[in-house]
Amino acid sequence: RRFLDRGGRWLAIHGAAAYIEFKGPEVEIGGITLPGLTDTPDRQPDYMDLLGCRFVSHLAPQEIAIESVSDHEIVRGLQPLAVVDEPYILEIRGDCEVLLSSRYTGEAPGYVEGPWLEDVPRPQALLHRRGLGETLYLAPGHCVGPYDLRPFIDELPAHPGPWANPAYRELLRRAIRWGTG
């Protein structure tokens, strides 16, 4: 909190906005047995307030079309992105400037919250100001290694997600430059 209040910049990516718990009996989703439905209770409100958002749920991984909705230096002139990722549903906290947005609707398999059927803009990158500082949060960023879901499944196919996309890597370069500038 003091870091941001004094002018610090914090770059947070993808799962940084998530706090999850499993609820209820075991459930099988896509061949993977989970210890229950995934719940995202608001148990870390101070942290989420610093971040500017809270992860609520996500749709099944799919291609997401993302476009700039701001003239901020981080996204100015950035080509539209089409990335394979988990389409995140976020709860915005506080005064945030949305930099990138997308639209999607659908089921949220394995989650307590959902389905998400309202066709509304979904933030993909946002800037949250606090004190003299700022937090930049990027929702895309899911990648899968072969052993990432142990102990739920022994091995699964690796997938780089948006990290394989040159436009996403350019966004990351800009975000890092912003964070260190």
What does each model-identified segment do?
Residues 26, 32, 38-41, 94-95, ...:
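Short, surface-exposed, polar/charged, turn-prone segments marking secondary-structure boundaries
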Residues 53-139, 143:
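Catalytic beta-strand/loop cores that center a nucleophilic Ser/Cys/Thr
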Residues 114-124, 129-181:
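Extracellular ligand-binding/catalytic regions of CAZymes and related secreted enzymes
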Residues 5, 39-42, 46-49, 71, ...:
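Acidic-enriched, low-complexity/disordered segments with a strong bias for Aspartate over Glutamate
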Residues 20-23, 110, 147-148:
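Short glycine-/acidic-enriched loop or helix-start segments at secondary-structure transitions
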Residues 1-4, 89, 125, 176:
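Short amphipathic alpha-helical segments and helix-helix/interface helices
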Residues 1-77:
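A glycine-rich, often tryptophan-bearing local segment used as a flexible ligand/cofactor-contacting loop or short
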